[in-house]
Amino acid sequence: MQVIKDGETLRIGPLEVTAHLTPGHTAGGTSWSWKSCEEARCLHIAYVDSLTPVSSDTFLFTRNATYPNVLKDFEQSFATVSALPCDILLTPHPEASDLWSRLERREHGDPNALVDAAACRHLADAARERLLKRVVKESSEQGSAAKGT
């Protein structure tokens, strides 16, 4: 067994993958990036671990004793993912990267349907927006509870 740290590269045969710590959805979230070449064309591929602020109703992102750095971790992960070289984005939940519609477009003749150099940034921006909505909801619920309403 080998522990891979943030920014370290792991070689698997001819493939070199780089680890990127992306905690938030889980404290140990890790994303990976690598370059893949076919003939003269090389693309940067990123597998981005879940950035979704989904949890049970009892888990509070704004005040959580078991994971007090969750909001800070999410922001760090959003910045990391936004900065990744990312021609092709892969996610644990295919709908997060619009994989199904991209594959359909590819089947209908678009050879570059999977390629989007802004995909990682878009994913991070969308996840940040969902987290902000959750934080606003928690804050308004806390305010209502404090007022006794």
Spans of features found by a protein language model:
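Residue(s) in the substrate-gating loop at a strand-loop-helix junction
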Residues: D6
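C-terminal regulatory/interaction regions
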Residues: P111-T149
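Metallo-beta-lactamase
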Residues: M1, T9-R11, E16-A118, H122
